[in-house]
């Protein structure tokens, strides 16, 4: 982890930076602190308070925006939670001919508009997707051990199986 600001680079510890410094997080940083149970519980809390008591939820979390070019596209998802704190945006860039997708997450302080963090969103996206599936399985499946059906065999499939195993006893997995 490192912070940047005013041309200086400093090491950040325990996710803290000096005032005015932006925290830069790469995939390795995310992986080094990630925990399935923490992620799933954070999502559980977020989904329980998702409406923030706001009548126009779309004002806080507008529909995604997509810009398309000849060889790629850029999608933006943004949100401003009602509790204050941070607001953010996730950018997804895709170049289908190159078979490449990249993600960037930017977090800002709602009170000051200060850029707090920039994170490579590749690992975060995989973890969040799998943690959401695990939360759904935990809430919707009958109590007790599970046999999990998995589509595919890549990064997402492996992450989904690990996430479900963090909240339930998995007695088997079947490729579908």
Task: Give residue ranges: language-model regions.
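Glycine-rich adenosine-cofactor-binding loop
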Residues: 133, 141-167, 173-176
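Acidic/polar active-site rim loop that often engages polyanionic ligands
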Residues: 22-25, 165-169
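N-terminal ligand-binding/catalytic initiation module
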Residues: 2-6, 10-126, 134, 141-144
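Flexible, glycine/proline-enriched loop segments at strand-loop-helix junctions
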Residues: 29-30, 120-124, 150, 170-176
């Amino acid at each position: 982890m490192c912070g940047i600001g005013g041309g200086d680079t400093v090491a950040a510890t325990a996710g803290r930076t000096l005032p005015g410094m932006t925290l830069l997080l790469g995939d390795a940083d995310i992986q080094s602190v990630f925990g399935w149970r923490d992620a799933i519980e954070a999502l559980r809390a977020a989904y329980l308070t998702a409406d923030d008591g706001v009548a126009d939820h779309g004002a806080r979390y507008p529909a995604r925006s997509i810009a398309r070019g000849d060889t790629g596209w850029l999608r933006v998802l943004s949100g401003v939670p009602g509790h204050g704190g941070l607001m953010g945006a996730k950018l997804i860039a895709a170049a289908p001919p190159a078979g490449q997708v990249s993600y960037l997450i930017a977090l800002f302080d709602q009170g000051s508009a200060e850029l707090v963090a920039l994170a490579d969103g590749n690992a975060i996206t995989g973890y969040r997707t799998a943690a959401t599936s695990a939360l759904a399985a935990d809430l919707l499946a009958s109590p007790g051990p599970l046999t999990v059906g998995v589509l595919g065999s890549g990064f997402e499939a492996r992450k989904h199986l690990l996430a479900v195993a963090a909240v339930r006893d998995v007695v088997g997995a079947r490729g579908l």
